[in-house]
């Protein structure tokens, strides 16, 4: 499932993040690449230990924790600290798949990458190209979202970023280990939760059907979750 999650950051928060990011020191993007990704990757990135990356990353994680749609879709157990990249002048990232396990450098903190996320930090009309293209059995899905919006997709997906031919694309990217490992199970829970919320808004939280469906949701989560 590929999902657009709007408004993770407000426009004011995006501006604050960009003010810090634009004055930071960027390095070659292959600093975090696996062997396959390094062959395809041409961009720049903030080092993982950068104070700016930590400060802006903490703000993003705080925003994610307050966003009910993100929680419902991802059911996060662990979130890898957000990283940051930028593309301009034809820079691109060819087709690749993300590493299954991400290790935070200098620590023993590991994340199984069930989900990948990209949070856009530049408005789409400010640059040409730079589309995130995610492949699945139904074809190729493209994302180029407003600043502050996030796209969430299975980390097992082949994906690429098209060349940026005008302007600059700035984004944060990170991985999530979900409480529910299987993408199909997680998608089913998300669909069920979405319908429960809609029915609750219409009938009220004390409606017998709402209560019954909520019980089914939690029993399925209990069956499938690692916590």
Swiss-Prot record:
Residues binding Fe cation: 96, 98, 159
Cofactor: Fe(2+); L-ascorbate
A GO MF term: 2-oxoglutarate-dependent dioxygenase activity
Domain Fe2OG dioxygenase: from-to ranges: 78-178
E.C. number(s) listed in UniProt: 1.14.11.-
Keywords on record: Dioxygenase, Iron, Metal-binding, Oxidoreductase, Vitamin C
Protein's UniProt keywords contain Manganese: no
GO biological-process terms attached to the record: DNA damage response; intracellular iron ion homeostasis
Note on how the cofactor is bound: Binds 1 Fe(2+) ion per subunit.
InterPro entries referenced in this protein's UniProt entry, alphabetically: Oxoglu/Fe-dep_dioxygenase_dom, PKHD_C, PKHD_hydroxylase, Pro_4_hyd_alph, Pro_4_hyd_alph_FE2OG_OXY
A Pfam cross-reference name: PKHD_C
Binding positions for 2-oxoglutarate per the UniProt entry: 169
Broad EC category: oxidoreductase
Protein name: PKHD-type hydroxylase Bcen2424_4810
